[in-house]
C-alpha cells in the first residue's frame, strides 16, 4: 500500500505535489499545472494555505524510511 509523503526526488518547493503525484501514480508536471489552475480559479489563498499546511502535516520521504 502506498503511503503519502513529500517527495525528495520529485520536488520543486517542498515536495508536496511530487509526493501526491507519486502516491496517485500521476505525472507531477500535470498535477502542478492543475494546482496552478486551481489556485488561479480560487484566488490563490486557499490553495496556498492547503499547500503550507501539507508541508507540516505530510512527512518527508526520508522520514518514512
Swiss-Prot record:
The organism's place on the tree of life at top rank: Bacteria
Membrane topology qualifier: Single-pass membrane protein
Main localization category: membrane
Pfam (any one): PspC
Segments passing through the bilayer: 37-57
GO terms under cellular component: plasma membrane
Keyword Cell membrane in annotation: yes
UniProt KW keywords: Cell membrane, Membrane, Transmembrane, Transmembrane helix
Keyword Manganese included in the entry's annotation: no
Compartments where found: Cell membrane
Name assigned to this protein: Uncharacterized membrane protein YvlC
Organism: Bacillus subtilis (strain 168)
Biological classification of the source: Bacteria, Bacillati, Bacillota, Bacilli, Bacillales
Gene: yvlC
Amino acid at each position: 500500500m502506498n503511503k503519502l509523503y513529500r517527495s525528495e526526488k520529485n520536488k520543486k518547493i517542498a515536495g508536496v505535489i511530487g509526493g501526491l503525484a507519486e502516491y496517485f501514480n500521476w505525472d507531477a508536471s500535470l498535477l502542478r499545472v492543475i494546482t496552478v489552475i486551481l489556485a488561479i480559479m480560487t484566488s490563490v489563498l486557499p490553495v496556498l494555505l492547503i499547500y503550507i499546511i501539507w508541508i507540516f502535516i505530510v512527512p518527508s520521504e526520508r522520514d518514512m524510511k
